[in-house]
């Protein structure tokens, strides 16, 4: 049986390259994208296009776009419809803090963890959770830091039977885009 992974796939550069890395390392991947009312839907479109391309070219990636549209209007962020304009330019801490979506990666992680644990239990195997978070996000997004990932994983293990069958892969956690 192939190694199993559940990937948070935004459709951006980071998570897309993690997907390719997983496939190159012989993983069976379940990719999840989240539609939470973000203004830049182009990444979700790119995620679907990438999955379609890969599946037409010899890979088999299970893909699910999960809608969290009910959160629109409840979350305060410039990234979400109804918020102010999205800041442009380089990742500068002052202007990029407006792009923080409260608890976004925790919301995503809870869903991804549940899917990974379900796969582990049904297939009686270990499952890796893969994310494209990287060091360039640490100053801006607290939920992209190792300390957050560790605490979140510990809570997951405390709250679920067989959680030791699920591990994290974050290949870019200490790397930067530049």
Feature map (PLM): residue ranges:
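ATP-dependent adenylation/nucleotidyltransferase module used to activate substrates
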Residues: 1-178
């Amino acid at each position: 049986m192939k190694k199993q992974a559940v990937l948070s796939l935004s459709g951006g550069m980071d998570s897309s390259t993690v997907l390719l890395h997983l496939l190159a390392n012989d993983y069976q991947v379940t990719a999840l994208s989240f539609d939470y009312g973000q203004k830049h839907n182009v990444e979700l479109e790119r995620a679907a296009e990438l999955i379609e391309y890969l599946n037409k070219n010899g890979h088999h990636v299970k893909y699910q776009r999960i809608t969290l549209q009910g959160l629109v209007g409840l979350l305060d962020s410039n990234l979400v419809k109804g918020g102010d304009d999205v800041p442009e330019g380089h990742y500068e801490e002052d202007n990029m803090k407006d792009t923080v979506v409260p608890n976004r990666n925790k919301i995503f992680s809870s869903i991804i963890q549940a899917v990974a644990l379900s796969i582990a239990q049904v297939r009686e195997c270990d499952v890796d959770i893969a994310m494209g978070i990287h060091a360039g996000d640490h100053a801006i997004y607290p939920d992209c830091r190792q300390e957050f990932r560790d605490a979140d994983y510990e809570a997951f293990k405390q709250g679920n039977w067989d959680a030791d069958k699920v591990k994290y892969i974050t290949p870019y956690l200490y790397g930067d885009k530049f």
